[in-house]
Amino acid sequence: MSDQLKIADKTFTSRLFTGTGKFATGEEMFHALQASGSELVTVALRRIDIDGQEDDILKWLKKGNFNLLPNTSGARNAKEAVFAATLAREALGTNWLKLEIHPDPKYLMPDPIETLKAAEELVKAGFVVLPYIHADPVLCKRLEEVGCAAVMPLGSPIGSNKGLRTRDFLEIIIEQSNVPVIVDAGIGAPSQAAEAMELGAAAVLVNTAMAVAGDTKAMGKAFGMAVEAGRMAHLAKLAPVSNAAHASSPLLSFLNDL
């Protein structure tokens, strides 16, 4: 059965999206991403040498033939994000964009007001916008209404590896959304990625948990397998949760004859 994910003009077989930060080397990053099976990777514009011919990150990403999703990490408001997006489109030749606006450098919480403002402007400018946001069901609907191709609510703070601390809100967002929901930030273990997929998320984005693992290549593969398992479980429909016990084996009536 085909179970591809379609976002705007692209179709993906893998539902694991990945980041490129924090890896020790470009080569290590490449092998981890390859092992994960990821087809879409996000990269911060500030990490790319636009004028350079041999940028390390881009060299390895092009070798893997990944789809690039530039992000506006570092932008503090809508104006800066739109400027960064324009540079990214010119430098990388893609209108796809992960919109990130977080003015607080300590906790990196996304600014909902500036994000909505920037999203509306960028969609009108022809960008395929995937906004990183709080797990706010109302905000997600507003972003959907202005034309975002997907929404990317956080599971917990960026790089925290705390997992799905926003689970209750993620469930509401997934239930109400008419665009793909990609759980982004805070996923620290393959089991947490599987959990997000079991909830019905269209995809997850993972970076830190892979990049700082003891064996990044093995962890990449583990995340790829976990996402597949979680998606399969969701499609198979999980058994209902019950407070009562239910025997898995039938009662044996012959015992009554003893």
UniProtKB/Swiss-Prot annotation:
CDD domains membership: ThiG (cd04728)
Keyword Metal-binding: no
Cellular component aspect of the GO annotation: cytoplasm
Any GO MF annotation of the entry: thiazole synthase activity
Superkingdom classification of source: Bacteria
Biochemical pathway: Cofactor biosynthesis; thiamine diphosphate biosynthesis
Uppermost EC category: transferase
Pfam family membership, one: ThiG
GO BP terms, alphabetized: thiamine diphosphate biosynthetic process
Entry keyword annotation includes Transferase: yes
Role, per record: Catalyzes the rearrangement of 1-deoxy-D-xylulose 5-phosphate (DXP) to produce the thiazole phosphate moiety of thiamine. Sulfur is provided by the thiocarboxylate moiety of the carrier protein ThiS. In vitro, sulfur can be provided by H(2)S.
Subunit text: Homotetramer. Forms heterodimers with either ThiH or ThiS.
Protein name, as recorded: Thiazole synthase
Protein species of origin: Cytophaga hutchinsonii (strain ATCC 33406 / DSM 1761 / CIP 103989 / NBRC 15051 / NCIMB 9469 / D465)
Lineage of the organism: Bacteria, Pseudomonadati, Bacteroidota, Cytophagia, Cytophagales
